[in-house]
Amino acid sequence: MKILIAGAGPAGLYLAYLLKRQMHGWDVRVVEQNPRDSTFGFGVVFSDRAIEFLRGDDAETFDLITPAMQTWTNLTVVHRGTPVVIDGVGFAAIGRLRLLQLLQQRLASVSVRPEYEKALQSGDELQGYDLVVAADGVNSFVRRSQGDAFGTTVTYLQNKFAWYGTTKPFGTLTQTFVANADGTFNAHHYRHSARMSTFVVECDPATWDRAGFAAMDEAATLAYCERLFAETLAGHRMVSNKSVWRNFPNLRNARWSAGNTVLLGDAQRTAHFSIGSGTRLAMEDAIALSKSMLEFKHDIGGALAAFEAARRPVVEKLVAAADASAQWYERFPEHMRLAPREFAWSYIQRSGRIDPERLRRIAPKFAGGSEI
């Protein structure tokens, strides 16, 4: 069995490890266009039980990654300078580069070495394999090389966002909402190591225009955001890493496979970053596909059909929650008219996954109006 995996992100690396671990004789090749240890962004966040989903199938990887994660049990919403703590809503985070390095270790343990700085240039390079896996992100070359075989659609949200880091290690995942003469802004921020946090700045299009970001370079934009969130940063600096303004792409595919090619992770679909499920979905994709391949082996069509049948209902449920969350953010300037506690209630119920009854069960102090 010859397998080509395009993309050495979490989905591609973890799938390669799982396939080679369970079938030592398979030829598994991983190619990645970027240099090794070159990654954009800062941290990745996992909601609820972090990487608990790994424990049953892969205790070794679970035990390797878990000590490197930062965890917390509460969530904080800051509005009008007032922090509102929501107890019982925990998250965990890890630096994206650190996660990739740990997955590279797992891959080395089964003698697979990804080929970095190897950009696929032609569809001809996808020939000669029993299975081709597109784990090469939103702008997947593998997916695009097949024309409309997957029924791909992409729409873009209106809000602008830019991904930064900061040297301030925040105590919890925090959503900080602020306003100035230009308009309204939000920062999603959480620590992903003992000394660093991820800091995502978001604003609506009208605010972006009034602030004049279109005419600013990366350094000027960083300076503006540091001034804007000076109180939140408390003297710490923000860090840029190709931190350009973007619109979030909602990518969907009507079909997850075509012939012997299958889509994984962000090449298959995107889930808005506000619910912290993108990396988890990608790694769960890898688990599900590896199980289907183990069951069906050389019946590639059967394996890919079984993979989609098992995963699509789960993915669509989470993507629906992500879409609902994203729509709340698209209208966050309107929500900011609410008082801090009412605003926090609106925020925590935005995805439709936490109704008042469940909130009273998991966050009794917040739901009961107690100060934490």
Where are these regions (language model features)?
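Glycine-rich FAD pyrophosphate-binding loop
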Residues: L18-G41
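Beta1/beta-strand and adjacent pyrophosphate-binding region of the FAD-binding site
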Residues: M1-A11
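Conserved N-terminal helical subregion
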Residues: D48-W163, K365-I372
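Glycine-rich phosphate/pyrophosphate-binding beta-alpha loops
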Residues: R252, Q268-R280
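Conserved N-terminal glycine-rich FAD pyrophosphate-binding loop of Rossmann-like flavoproteins
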Residues: P35-F53
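Conserved FAD/dinucleotide-binding core of flavoprotein oxidoreductases
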Residues: I86-V89, G95, G171-N250
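FAD-binding beta-loop-beta segment adjacent to the flavin cofactor pocket
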Residues: N247-L264
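C-terminal helical "tail/cap" subdomain of flavin- and related membrane-associated enzymes
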Residues: R21, K291-I372
